[in-house]
Structures are given as C-alpha cells and as structure tokens.
C-alpha cells in the first residue's frame, strides 16, 4: 500500500477512535448532569455515580485556573495529534485515538461549561472522581505502553 494512502487510513482510524470517545463521553456527561441527583447512585461494591465538577486537568489534578488549564490541555492535544498522525498501524492508532478523544472531549466540556469545569461522575471511593474521557486517556496510555512492550514502533520512520 502506498505511504500516502496508509497515512490517510491511519489518520482516519485515529480520528474515528477519537470521535467515538467524544460522542460517548459527551452523552455520558449529559446523562450524569440530568439523571444524577446530589446523593448519587450506588452501582456495586465501591462503585458510585456521583455528580461533581472539576476545574483541574484529569482526576482533579492541576487547578491553575481555566486559562492555564485550557492552554496546557490544548498544547498536549496538539502534540498528541502531531504524533498520532504519524502512528504505525495497529495498537498505536487505537491508543492515540483514545488519548486524543479523551483530551478533546474534556476540553469541549470545559469550554462550554461555566465556570469552565469538567463534569465528573464515576467514583470508586479511594480515587478522585472521574469521567469516561479520563478513563479513555488512561486506557489509551496503557494501550500505547502495551504496543511498545510488544516491540511495536509507535510512529512511522
């Protein structure tokens, strides 16, 4: 397959994974804002659904304020996009798509929500409350680590 055609296919795969994350995460946050009350819902064991809002980046980290947080996240997203569009076929495209989708989805939520906070609603008790975009970023990172451990190059040379 010619290099240019392969590049377009990889770009499309990364963007499809990212778009899937953005859609699912946005719908889950909408549901959480409309369905969860102030008490939350016990699901099973330590898992609770509790609505809260987070001004930080991920898992309530870095509360520097909306401008700094937005600039940091946008810089990270641009770097991930640059690297992702040079990804090798396979696990790397999935990992980069999950990273990109999670970062973009949280940033969309932060930009449209006043006072520039992200909707979080998944609680496991001992860990900061998070959302599906946070989980997507974490899983994307793990997928990239697995790809590297299997000897895959993450980007084309």
Predicted regions and their residues:
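Alpha-helical transmembrane bundles and membrane-interface segments of multipass inner-membrane proteins
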Residues: 1-157
